[in-house]
């Protein structure tokens, strides 16, 4: 059983979850929110959605990379390409820890495959506070992924672009992730008193006090520690309106000019 508020989690052997006690605020560079020239309202946003691993996975650019392909570190090496497109915000597909992946398998997928591979968009969340080790140069190091992600955010901000995160709070990858902590509480419930499923996992019951707090605390954590400029909610309609408004208000209390792509 893993603490859902933990800041680092890993399942590198696909069998046993792991946790570490870290102080993310003390790791990596000191960050601030982006200052974006010409960006006044959300209608001014030019958003580039991108998968961290895909961005540098092309074999043709492998010899130009100093860092391992598909990582936060190699992403930095190609940031100028995005900047030259006139982008205001880089929207990262889910970077929080996700479930169905072997973080130690770094093989490049060169041929088309739709199943039985080690490729994942990240829409199967394992934790709402920890980062995926798939994008770290050493997934065994619980602190490195935090430092590398902060470095990426700093470099994006240094180029006058904002960072928005694609977040998946509507469900978890597996029912037991939250059911093991408190049965029949963290999820919305069916009429037969069983927890409601969604995409094979549990559908987060945001009308329940601690489920709502889990979501809002996660927003605040990534806002305070990583200075994320905005969030894109996956399947936002699965949440109740009060929770979404509270999440927006919490974000805005830290960053009045926040951008929320929901």
Spans of model-derived segments:
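Active-site capping/gating regions of soluble enzymes
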Residues: 230-231
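The feature marks proteins involved in alpha-glucan
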Residues: 1-47, 56-63, 67
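Substrate-binding/active-site clefts of carbohydrate-active enzymes
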Residues: 53-226, 235, 243-258, 262
């Amino acid at each position: 059983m893993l603490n859902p508020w933990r800041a680092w989690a890993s399942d590198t052997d696909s069998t046993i979850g792991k946790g570490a006690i870290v102080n993310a605020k003390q790791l990596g560079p000191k960050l601030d929110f982006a200052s974006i020239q010409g960006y006044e309202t959300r209608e001014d946003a030019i958003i580039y959605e991108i998968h961290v691993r895909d961005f540098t996975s092309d074999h043709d650019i492998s010899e130009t990379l100093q860092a391992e392909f598909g990582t936060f570190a190699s992403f930095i090496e190609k940031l100028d390409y995005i900047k030259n497109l006139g982008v205001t915000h880089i929207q990262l597909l889910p970077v929080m820890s996700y479930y169905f992946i072997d973080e130690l398998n770094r093989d490049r997928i060169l041929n088309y495959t739709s199943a039985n591979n080690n490729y994942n968009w990240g829409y199967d969340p394992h934790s709402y506070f920890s980062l995926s080790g798939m994008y770290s140069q050493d997934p065994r190091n619980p602190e490195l992924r935090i430092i590398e992600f902060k470095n990426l955010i700093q470099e994006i901000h240094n180029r006058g672009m904002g960072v928005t995160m694609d977040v998946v709070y509507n469900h978890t990858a597996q029912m037991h992730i939250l059911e093991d902590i408190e049965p029949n509480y963290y999820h919305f419930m069916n009429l037969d008193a069983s927890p409601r499923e969604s995409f094979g996992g549990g559908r987060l019951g945001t009308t329940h006090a601690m489920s709502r707090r889990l979501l809002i605390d996660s927003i605040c954590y990534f806002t305070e520690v990583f200075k994320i400029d905005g969030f894109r909610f996956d399947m936002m309609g699965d949440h109740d309106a009060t929770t979404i408004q509270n999440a927006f208000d919490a974000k805005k209390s830290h960053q009045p000019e926040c951008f929320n792509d929901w």
